[in-house]
Amino acid sequence: MTVPHIPRGPVMADIAAFRLTEEEKQRLLDPAIGGIILFRRNFQNIEQLKTLTAEIKALRTPELIIAVDHEGGRVQRFIEGFTRLPAMSTLGEIWDSEGAETAETHAEHIGWVLATELSACGIDLSFTPVLDLDWGNCAVIGNRSFHRNPEAVARLALALQKGLAKGGMKSCGKHFPGHGFVEGDSHLVLPEDGRSLDELEAADLAPFRIMSREGMAAVMPAHVVYPQVDTKPAGFSEIWLKQILRRDIGFKGVIFSDDLTMEGACGAGGIKERARISFEAGCDIILVCNRPDLVDELRDGFTIPDNQDLAGRWQYMENSLGHEAVQAVIQTTGFQAAQAFVAGLASPQDTAGGVKVGEAF
């Protein structure tokens, strides 16, 4: 059977379970779709995951980009057969107790293991690192954050990014310009951060600036309002995305929206209106998760925005390790030692409790 050539569209959707249904196959052939995000509900074991990703990639050319939230701690979608990754706050604790260089070395190992194991299963991208500062206010961020200190966050994220690159993956910093100061969970409410731009510049924006200079490939904005800067949430704001992120910071990479079904996005109107506002604000690619009915509503009469950079930006997010290369890495004693070391950093506190993040549960 001839594989259809369909340019990647600007929508990232999801699927229900372990295998594609015929309905999902038809949905994923729509020109509006360019990628898929997987969740825990899509994972049974490694062999099933490899079969699923191969099935997705065989649908069309260029292949759909496959992503996942696989940060470590309580946001690790695939467990059985994968190295258990520590929460990123573990690295912050090591930074404080053992020093910056030790923590950076550990962060690079985590990034390498994280990316290589996902690459071996046909995954292109993990939406990581979290660049939010841990102000002690936000339960949904909490131990997903490296540290409260902007320098520590930036340096640990850069080390993680270095490890991701060894495993064939690009980085995606989130949640611009910082979700750590607010109390609300933007999955459930629309939080407000009342600080001024100067206050944000002095702290939360610093890791994004540094990572942008050092090759961060993608950014995901927060569904948070910063009323002293703009009345719109950051992901819907031209001020935040076009003026501050693109012009002032000079970020050249991909802007992914956060999930447009989150409560923090719903106040903007129906799904078509949310999509329109996201694209006008400066998002390249939008996520619509856990609601295939909304994906179908969006697809109906969808006009692909004029974005001459879209094809190149999708291509940039492709995994850079071929199958043979990643299999060779996995067999090395050095990689296996890194797996064992990273697993030793994880703790029961990483795997149990805490706020659920982003799953339909």
Curated annotation (Swiss-Prot):
InterPro entries for this protein: Beta_hexosaminidase_bac (IPR022956), Glyco_hydro_3_AS (IPR019800), Glyco_hydro_3_N (IPR001764), Glyco_hydro_3_N_sf (IPR036962), Glycoside_hydrolase_SF (IPR017853), NagZ_Beta-hexosaminidase (IPR050226)
Binding site for substrate: 69, 77, 144, 174-175
Site (Important for catalytic activity): 185
Organism expressing this protein natively: Neisseria gonorrhoeae (strain NCCP11945)
Molecular function per GO: beta-N-acetylhexosaminidase activity
Catalytic reaction equation(s): Hydrolysis of terminal non-reducing N-acetyl-D-hexosamine residues in N-acetyl-beta-D-hexosaminides
Assigned GO CC terms: cytoplasm
Pathway info: Cell wall biogenesis; peptidoglycan recycling
Keyword Transit peptide: no
Name this polypeptide is given: Beta-hexosaminidase
Family: Belongs to the glycosyl hydrolase 3 family. NagZ subfamily.
Compartments, as annotated in UniProt: Cytoplasm
Principal EC category: hydrolase
SUPFAM superfamilies linked: (Trans)glycosidases
Source organism, top-level taxon: Bacteria
